[in-house]
């Protein structure tokens, strides 16, 4: 039997060495950054989200917003690379406690079938999954309201004020 999930598989430590990724091509940098952003977004609205996972996810999203464009433009900027490593670690802490969602499940299959980098597959699916999560059946109405409020909060953190919850 192959075990797909076991607590023994979780790492005890993470090494965040920005120097190891300075030679990553821009496409890899962009794809991994989108994966980090998706980890944080999904954890933020996951059923298992709590104050601690929300804080980690929010900080990760802010770091991605500020430093992903910088590392894409200037791959040797160690400070920006360190911030992206921190974003990745924070998003990992958030999703390992809150969970992930539909986006990642679909991105794994899409990426494998069509040979698309995982982060790119996440980015391709994200607008549709965000819309699906924000609008749904009456049975999910309370959870959807919480989700749209959280999406509106992220939109505000990203400087997109002035939108309604539905537009966010």
Language-model-derived ranges and their functions:
Residues 89-122:
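Glycine-rich phosphate/pyrophosphate-binding beta-alpha loops
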Residues 113-116, 120-168:
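Gly/Pro-rich interdomain helix-loop hinge
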Residues 6-74, 80, 87, 91:
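Core active-site phosphate/anionic-ligand binding loop and the adjoining beta-turn-alpha structural block
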Residues 65-66, 103-107, 149-158:
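Short acidic (Asp/Glu) and glycine-rich catalytic loops that position anionic groups and cofactors
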Residues 2-4:
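Short, small-residue-biased leader/transition segments that mark boundaries at the very start
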Residues 38-44, 49, 85, 109, ...:
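Glycine-rich flexible loops
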């Amino acid at each position: 039997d192959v075990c797909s999930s076991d607590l023994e598989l979780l790492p005890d430590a993470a090494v965040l060495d920005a120097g190891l990724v300075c030679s990553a091509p821009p496409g890899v940098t962009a794809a991994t950054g989108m994966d980090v952003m998706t980890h944080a977004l999904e954890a933020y609205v996951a059923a298992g989200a709590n104050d601690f996972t929300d804080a980690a996810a929010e900080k990760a999203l802010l770091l991605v917003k500020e430093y992903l464009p910088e590392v894409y433009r200037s791959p040797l900027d160690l400070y920006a690379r360190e911030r992206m490593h921190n974003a990745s670690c924070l998003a990992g802490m958030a999703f390992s406690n809150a969970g992930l969602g539909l986006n990642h499940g679909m991105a794994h299959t899409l990426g494998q079938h069509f040979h698309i980098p995982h982060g790119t597959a996440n980015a391709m699916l994200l607008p549709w999954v965000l819309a699906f999560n924000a609008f749904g059946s009456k049975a999910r109405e309370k959870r959807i309201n919480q989700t749209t409020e959280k999406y509106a909060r992220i939109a505000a953190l990203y400087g997109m004020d002035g939108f309604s919850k539905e537009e966010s």
